Structures are given as C-alpha cells and as structure tokens.
Amino acid sequence: MSSIHDLDFIKEKLEELKKAGVYRKLTVLESPSGPRSIIDGKEVINLSSNNYLGLANHPRLKKAAIEAIEKWGVGAGAVRTIIGNMTIHEELERKLAEFKREEAVLTFQSGFTANMGVIQAVVDKGDVIISDELNHASIIDGCRLSRADVVIYKHSDMEDLERVLKEVKDKYRVKMIITDGVFSMDGDIAKLPEIVKLAEKYSAITYVDDAHASGVLGESGRGSADHFNLHGRIDIQIGTLSKAIGVVGGYVAGKRELIEWLNHRGRPFLFSTALPPAAVAASIEAINILSESDALTRKLWDNAKYFKEKLKSLGFDTGKSETPITPVIIGEETKALEFSRKLFEEGVFAQGIVYPTVPKNKARVRTIVTAAHTKEDLDAALKAFEKVGKQLNII
C-alpha cells in the first residue's frame, strides 16, 4: 500500500521534467572557481560563473580568510543581536558604506535573504510595491512575504511605470518602486535616471537590487547608483558579496535610520547566525582591492566588449545585453540544452537556461566573461561557439 511518505506526487513532477527534456543534475566542480575549471575530470573554459573579477580564488582573499579563522574561529556562534556580532562584522559594514558612499550598511547571509528581509520590513499591508516584470526571484519572494499589494510594470517600460504610478498615486500610504540594477538573464541595465525622476514626481521610494552591478558598474564597481551619478537619490540599495566580491553574503545600503529599523525588523538578519569570520575577512579584503584600483573592472569590461562583439559577428542573437552578462538566445528549450551539452564536449562550460527561469521560447545559453579570462580563453570559446552553432543550424 502506498504511503504519503512515498512522495508519489513529487515523483510524478520529476517525471514530467524528464519527459519535457528539462530535467537536470547539479554540475560538480572539482577545482576552484576560475576562468578554467575542472568538471567531470575535464578542464573547461568557465563561462557561467558570477565570479566577475576573479576574486573567488585571489591569494589576498585566501590569506585574509585563513588569518580570520586563526583569530576568530570558523563560525560566529550566534545571531548578531545576541552574541554573534564581532568587530569584523562592524568593520565590513563600515567599509561597504564608504565604498557605496552611503550612510550605513547591514549585512545578510545572502543577497536572496537581504531582499526577503528588507522588503517585508519596509512595506506592509496598505502599501504598494511597483516591480519590474523581470526582477529576480528573491524580489518576487520578498514581495509575497511583505503583505503589500504588488503591481507589475512592463520590463524597463517607463510609460507603463508612469501609468501604474498615476493609478496608485492616492491609494496607498507607501509606494515603492523595485528594480534590478542589471537584469541577470538579459544583461541589460535598468533605466535608473528615469525611474528616479518618476519616483520623485510621484513620491515613491526607490529600491535597487545591485547584485549584478556591484563590482561591475560605476567607479571601481561601486554599482548602478554610481554609474548614473545618483548618490543620495536611491533610497535602498541591495548588494551581494557572492558575485564580483567572490565570497558569500548580501547587504543593504542606505540611510542610517533604515539600517536601524532593519536591526529590529529584518527577519533573516534577526534569526540567522552571523556570517562566518573567514567570509567577512575575505569580503573586507575584496573591498580593499577594489578601492585601491579599477584595473579589474577595466579588464572585465575589455573582455566583455570583445566577446560580445565577436559573438554578434558570428551571427548569434545576444539580445539587449549591455554588460558582461551575454545571453545567446536559442528559443527552443531542448535545443538550448543540447547547445550547452555540445559546448561542453568542445571544452566550454556555458549553462543552458530554460523556463521557468526565462520565458517559454526564450531559452538561451547565458555567458559571463570575467576579468580573469585571457584573450586565448575567449578565442577558444568563440571557436567552440561557432562550431556548435553551425552544427545545430543556429548560425
């Protein structure tokens, strides 16, 4: 006799994924994250990492992490509101606030939990969130948890955003516009100057998730607010320590009063053990490196421009990308996954992205070049893209 504990309903859902050709297993990395990585015993050019600046295996970050373990141990031992708040946590937040040119910063365990915690702490029932339709899943989940009404506007469509703002103008206590700074699947940049003007016109709060802009846009990677010279005009900025910074964690930057409030009402902050000392120390060292020089961000953009232009010249559809995130849009889901598999056979790891991560018929292979890639790496990858693209009649 079958039991509910057999989880037959889950097995059926897994079978549906397999029949649709979109079932996947986790890739196992057998080396540090870098421009070339070892997967299944094979060295491949890595075009799927968020390690934009190559800091994840940087000797200065590793040294800082090791020294922190020797001094502080491997864990904080408690939430920060009890006895897990170490001096290095405070130091990291000071460094981040200076780097972002904001009054204060509060760190979280990830960018995902930062979005979930901040949104639900800032808005509530009787408020409204106005969210771009392509915002990250963590924003979507944060909106759901907040109990506020949510209105979606068409992606980067300022006319539609203004239409929504007019509709909600006198209906809510707090109005908050939320957007990614850089959109993770298409690589386009939010129209922040226009969003800020509309927010000021209609008395709305602005909230920007800079996960893919931190370390990428602006002076030495200070983010999208710096990129557009909007310091002091964006109310809430979310950042991550897990991508360009090369470590793990997330943070929110803004006014001191905002950070004080989140100290009291940011649930993931309140109920999760503090970031481990090694991660904190490595993040501090990453900020030090970025503050000293813009060499890594310049190399990142040189590589991104070169790779994107070459892909376009081969005939690939790279959509509306403006950043080191460059999608190769295939359309059909099974074909995108096959494209990814064949690239791996040619020594290139570039992840196939399918529904529900992207809309149906918009499947793609998403590439991210880094500052650590050499021109030889990129040329070898381009050769593989050309070969597989012709095999599958994509170009």
UniProtKB/Swiss-Prot annotation:
NCBIfam families (UniProt xref): bioF (TIGR00858), gly_Cac_T_rel (TIGR01825), PRK06939.1 (NF005394)
Gene Ontology MF, one: glycine C-acetyltransferase activity
Key words of the record: Acyltransferase, Biotin biosynthesis, Pyridoxal phosphate, Transferase
Organism, as annotated: Thermoanaerobacter pseudethanolicus (strain ATCC 33223 / 39E) (Clostridium thermohydrosulfuricum)
Keyword RNA-binding found: no
EC class of the enzyme, as a word: transferase
InterPro entries: Aminotrans_II_pyridoxalP_BS (IPR001917), Aminotransferase_I/II_large (IPR004839), AON_synthase_class-II (IPR050087), AONS_Archaea/Firmicutes (IPR010962), AONS_Archaea/Proteobacteria (IPR004723), PyrdxlP-dep_Trfase (IPR015424), PyrdxlP-dep_Trfase_major (IPR015421), PyrdxlP-dep_Trfase_small (IPR015422)
Binding site for pyridoxal 5'-phosphate: 111-112, 184, 209-212, 240-243
Cofactor(s) the protein requires to work: pyridoxal 5'-phosphate
Protein name (Swiss-Prot/TrEMBL): 8-amino-7-oxononanoate synthase
Subunit structure: Homodimer.
Origin superkingdom: Bacteria
Positions contributing to substrate binding: 24, 136, 357
Functional description taken from the UniProt entry: Catalyzes the decarboxylative condensation of pimeloyl-[acyl-carrier protein] and L-alanine to produce 8-amino-7-oxononanoate (AON), [acyl-carrier protein], and carbon dioxide.
Residues bearing PTM N6-(pyridoxal phosphate)lysine: 243
Similarity comment: Belongs to the class-II pyridoxal-phosphate-dependent aminotransferase family. BioF subfamily.
Pathway annotation: Cofactor biosynthesis; biotin biosynthesis
Catalytic reactions on record: 6-carboxyhexanoyl-[ACP] + L-alanine + H(+) = (8S)-8-amino-7-oxononanoate + holo-[ACP] + CO2
Gene Ontology biological process: biotin biosynthetic process
E.C. code: 2.3.1.47
